[in-house]
Amino acid sequence: MGVQPPNFSWVLPGRLAGLALPRLPAHYQFLLDQGVRHLVSLTERGPPHSDSCPGLTLHRMRIPDFCPPSPEQIDQFVKIVDEANARGEAVGVHCALGFGRTGTMLACYLVKERALAAGDAIAEIRRLRPGSIETYEQEKAVFQFYQRTK
């Protein structure tokens, strides 16, 4: 039986969710129960017990805490989500607490998916997940992604 991971919420229901670092095997089972088949880990160290759930594919992108993802990491994240969603599979993304790095990636995906301006995507992620996108550099990464993709 799955147990909801800390700070779990859908940003695009059934397609893309954010969460804090999963720490228990039951957290991974919850993700599987929700249809999540891909977990993007943005922490420098891998999530504990991630090998406890063979039905979940782990994608590692090491980003230091309070830092923004690189343009290449953002592009890789968008590709993972697009490819998984095209197969009907949902994606979860996490950092330590599910706010800074996670929120940044989620906002970038909204820029691409909903054709939102960077400020609107940041505002929407903060509405859905209060406290998200913690630093100026993380905000700047969303604006730079918007500039690259418009």
Curated annotation (Swiss-Prot):
Domain of life: Eukaryota
Primary role: Protein phosphatase that mediates dephosphorylation of proteins phosphorylated on Tyr and Ser/Thr residues. In vitro, it can dephosphorylate p44-ERK1 (MAPK3) but not p54 SAPK-beta (MAPK10) in vitro. Able to enhance activation of JNK and p38 (MAPK14).
Keywords: Cytoplasm, Hydrolase, Nucleus, Protein phosphatase
Catalytic activity: O-phospho-L-tyrosyl-[protein] + H2O = L-tyrosyl-[protein] + phosphate; O-phospho-L-seryl-[protein] + H2O = L-seryl-[protein] + phosphate; O-phospho-L-threonyl-[protein] + H2O = L-threonyl-[protein] + phosphate
SMART domains assigned: DSPc (SM00195), PTPc_motif (SM00404)
Protein's cellular compartments: Cytoplasm, Cytosol; Nucleus
Tyrosine-protein phosphatase domain boundaries: 7-150
Chief place where the protein resides: cytoplasm
Family stated for the protein in its record: Belongs to the protein-tyrosine phosphatase family. Non-receptor class dual specificity subfamily.
Signal peptide extent: none
Pfam families recorded: PTP-SAK (PF22784)
Record-given protein name: Dual specificity protein phosphatase 23
GO biological process: dephosphorylation
Active site per UniProt: C95
